[in-house]
């Protein structure tokens, strides 16, 4: 049995939905109860999602500040993102976050600033004919945006957008953030910078090789580890390079797979369904409580986000449920099956939650306050 009450803040009306087996009941403002009978679990999910989305489009919002771990704290309609990348910018030290979407036929790109309960603090028009692929929140109160392969800096105070790192579009960018560190690619060099202390941590000149794969133009990928001791990058077909950010030492891992991620303690690096010790690059057995399919290709789904010992893992398809694991004890804490994901979603941890930006045009927050 699942029941949720949505509130429309503009009209103060309530809308309630109840799912009992294969029966859906809805009720607007204490009026007549409508009953929908379904003949399968799939139909229940589909019709319930559709009913909730219909009300959310009218301004109804679901909020539950007392949600248990893995339960929804908020569902809100923001509007479909025309570019399909569903960018989010979060950080593990704060609960507020930023979501960007392209409105209409690239008429505008809108940046939303949400608080941890899902209230909109601010919306900013970034302008027409923009396409932000990804964005990160830096400790100096700026966002770095990858706008169609051009890195730009957005000030949260002045709302000014300025060019950052690469001045011309070379179809090659890297952008990642972990703690106070941010990683980016200038078109010639990978840079890791600490915005909290305003110091450069590491810099390396690399040339990204052209790709033979029709899905992307260049091998150009870089990421930081959860504890900020390592970086990983890929600029050629068959190998990843792991960098120790303190010593500058490098380990080369021969692997042409996809979907890399680090363990919460930075000791293991996984890519293409294989596992390696980050210090030596030696192969190792799977240290995680969840299995990972070997030989992961570009089009497969294996998305992993980390906060402390927590790992949010989505595998198989972009619409698959997200598993929330506690790696300190190997426990599966929750399985998040968001009703507003059609084919894919982007998700990221905040200080106490997991935020989803979905292709149905919704923003959901799930409680991860341990």
State the predicted function of each range.
Residues 10-35:
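Short aromatic-glycine-(Arg/Gly/Cys) micro-motifs in beta-strand/loop hairpins
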Residues 40-57:
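A short, charged, amphipathic alpha-helix used as a generic interaction element across diverse proteins
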Residues 71-80, 109-126, 149-166, 189-212, ...:
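Surface-exposed loop/turn elements that mediate protein-protein interactions on large endomembrane-trafficking
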Residues 83-94, 127-140, 165-180, 206-227, ...:
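Repeated scaffold domains used in trafficking and secretory/extracellular systems
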Residues 103-108, 146, 185, 234-238, ...:
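Short, solvent-exposed loop/turn segments at conserved positions within beta-propeller repeat blades
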Residues 342-370:
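Blade-level signature of beta-propeller repeat domains, shared across WD40, Kelch, NHL, RCC1
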